[in-house]
From Swiss-Prot:
<dbReference type="InterPro" id="IPR036806">
    <property type="entry name" value="YozE_SAM-like_sf"/>
</dbReference>
<comment type="similarity">
    <text>Belongs to the UPF0346 family.</text>
</comment>
<protein>
    <recommendedName>
        <fullName>UPF0346 protein SSP1318</fullName>
    </recommendedName>
</protein>
<dbReference type="InterPro" id="IPR023089">
    <property type="entry name" value="YozE_SAM-like"/>
</dbReference>
<dbReference type="Pfam" id="PF06855">
    <property type="entry name" value="YozE_SAM_like"/>
</dbReference>
<dbReference type="InterPro" id="IPR010673">
    <property type="entry name" value="UPF0346"/>
</dbReference>
Length: 73
């Protein structure tokens, strides 16, 4: 089982030609993003209130779901 932060996983989505790739780029460009965080609620709250993200929160939900699956392997 992996023990990486969501930020680390999001970097693997950079370069995708979909909304998840766009979100990953926005996360990468956000210097204040909580890079060591794993908790869904803390990350979701940050994206909703602190970040300046143009992507729908449902895209974050989907990417976080991929993250939880990725951690299992």
């Amino acid at each position: 089982m992996k023990d990486h932060s969501f930020y680390h996983f999001a970097l693997t989505a950079r370069g995708r030609k979909d909304e998840k790739g766009e979100l990953a780029e926005e996360i990468f460009d956000d210097l204040s993003f909580p890079k060591h965080e794993k908790d869904f609620h803390i990350l979701s709250d940050y994206i909703e209130t602190q970040g300046h993200y143009t992507i729908s929160l449902s895209v974050f939900d989907d990417l976080y779901e991929e993250y939880t699956e990725w951690l299992k392997f």
